[in-house]
Design a protein with these regions (language model features):
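Short alpha-helical segments that sit at the start of domains
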Residues: 3-31
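Short amphipathic alpha-helical elements of helix-turn-helix/winged-helix folds
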Residues: 33-37
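Short acidic, hydrophobic short linear motifs in intrinsically disordered regions
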Residues: 39-53
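Short amphipathic alpha-helical interaction segments
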Residues: 54-68
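A short, conserved structural fragment
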Residues: 68-79
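Short, amphipathic alpha-helical interaction segments positioned at domain boundaries
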Residues: 85-118
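Long, low-complexity, charge-rich intrinsically disordered regions
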Residues: 120-123, 133-249
């Protein structure tokens, strides 16, 4: 069911942005290093991250305890990082392949902005939670190159101030858990009607604007990517993916 007076994608980002973590320059470097080391496909220990940053392991442990980093990190029993900021080295719903290595993302949105941080093209495969149909995307550092099926959409949930900045468990269960790719708008509407959630919306390639804001706004100066994230790519039907229509979740 469509929600009356749905937000535009710009309006959504204006609402979401204040809730996202900000990073100091040294925290940006740690965050980008975490993403890039995780993209190698295995858990990260302090020594590995220290080598990547050229600093002592003791300094790494202190940096990982900063609130902005800690609230986006989860680790195994030995303290090795298994996931950070939407990227995981352990299985989740959204498969995210980079350079032939199998990774996963916490939600559908993560797969749109992380390629820019990694400076790598990702092949995404994510089951529609309503029908089981696999939504496939090729996402480069600068654009969404292809989407199949062409009518695919992505759902979003309105941000809650109590979610962000608390814990990884909260972010995943109360935010990421409602952000999926659907093979069609109708599928998304059906899924959220059944779930009886009332604050989700479907957007599409318009989210390129949002992923640019996140990747550049949070990690500006640490990503090292030139160029623009505008455009949908020759293989992506932006009109289909940018309806901006809303669904009741």
């Amino acid at each position: 069911m469509l929600v009356p007076n749905p937000p535009t994608s710009d309006g959504y980002w204006e609402t979401l942005w204040p809730h996202l973590r900000s990073f100091s320059p040294d925290e940006q470097r740690v965050a980008v290093a975490l993403y890039r080391e995780l993209s190698k496909g295995a858990a990260i220990d302090d020594a590995q991250l220290a080598r990547a940053l050229g600093i002592a392991p003791a300094e790494i442990r202190a940096l990982l305890q900063r609130d902005s980093i800690k609230s986006l990190t989860y680790a195994d029993g030995e303290g090795r990082v298994l996931g950070f900021g939407g990227l995981a080295a352990t299985p989740m719903h959204h498969r995210f392949e980079v350079d032939g290595r199998e990774l996963w993302t916490w939600c559908a949105w993560d797969s749109l902005f992380i390629p820019e941080i990694l400076r790598r093209t990702a092949h995404v495969a994510s089951p529609d939670p309503e029908t089981g149909e696999i939504v496939r995307l090729v996402v480069s550092p600068g654009e969404i190159k292809s989407v199949k099926p062409a009518k695919a959409v992505i759902s979003f949930i309105r941000p809650d101030a109590q979610i962000f900045g608390t814990s990884v468990a909260n972010v995943i269960s109360r935010f990421c858990h409602f952000i999926f790719f659907f093979a069609s708008l109708e599928s998304g509407e059906n899924a959220f009607a059944l779930a009886k959630r009332f604050n989700a919306h479907n957007f599409g390639a318009e989210l390129l604007v949002g992923r640019q804001r996140l990747a550049r706004g949070s990690f500006d100066g640490s990503i090292g990517v030139a160029g623009s994230s505008r455009g949908s790519g020759s293989g992506c039907d932006a009109r289909r993916l940018s309806t901006g229509r809303s669904i009741r979740a």
